[in-house]
Amino acid sequence: MKNAIFKLFKVTFPFALAFMMCLPFSMTLNAASVKNIPVKKILSADITGDGKADKILITTSMDKDCFIKKLKVKVNNKVAFTKNCTNNNIHSFTARYAKMSNKNELLQLMGIGDNDYIVFNQIYKYNNKSKKLYSVSKLDYTACEIVSAKKNLLTLRHGDQPAETGWLNWKMNYKFRNNKLVLTSTTTSTVKSIIGNYHNDSYSKLFRKNIFVTEKKLRFYNGSKLAFTVPKGKQVTLKKLTLSKNTMYLQFQYGKKTGW
């Protein structure tokens, strides 16, 4: 996949998402295992792994410019996590609770800054010995959120905004292994164009079907081998997304042929 023509797809993944707007994600959740956690309101849910409901409370303090200067998470009235947010320009925090099993309960914290930029995003697990939350993810500034949780699987919806395609989102599955969330596969066929959801012109109708029109002649590859060439003004269909060494590639179909 070295010579993919969509050069802007070949960006370092965390960097590409560091300066992007927060995705207009759907609020549809797996109701049985994923919950939104309101700030400054107690959520009763098991986070310690004993099967009993714990008290989870998230609070924030503001500076004179209405930015959050400190985030605090309490579990059963004891401080389990603090974050100094001074100079991070965070306006608000969103939080989600996810239960995979009685031993794997997770808490996602996302800090939102100016223009809905994602400033902070991590997933945490509770340590019963230290009574503290510790990170099990490497999300950093990426735009993603937990959407469902099962016994052995956590699903996150991710997003990016390549210049050639506009907003895309997709889902990735993770397993909890050695106290870390690990991708089960680096390739997904769930990738979708979402920019067509906000307009009603002829191109938007195509985007809603994952169809794009080439602005110039493009070459598509399978590995280092040229798969096919598409003339200007032709339609190609987005089929898959894959991640390799912090690089994102997109697979398109032209007729019966596919290439990256």
Predicted regions located by residue number:
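Sec-dependent signal peptide cleavage junction
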Residues: F19-K35
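Short aromatic loop motif centered on NTY/YTY
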Residues: S92-I123, S130-F207
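Structural core positions within WD40/WD-like beta-propeller blades
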Residues: D54-I58, Q108
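Beta-propeller domains
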Residues: I68-V73
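Blade-edge motifs of beta-propeller repeat domains
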Residues: A32-K35, N77-I90, S135-L139, L226
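Beta-loop motif signature
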Residues: I194-Y249, Q253-G259
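Residues in Ca2+-coordinating acidic/glycine-rich loops
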Residues: A45-A53, A98-E105
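Bacterial N-terminal signal peptides that target proteins for export
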Residues: K2-F15
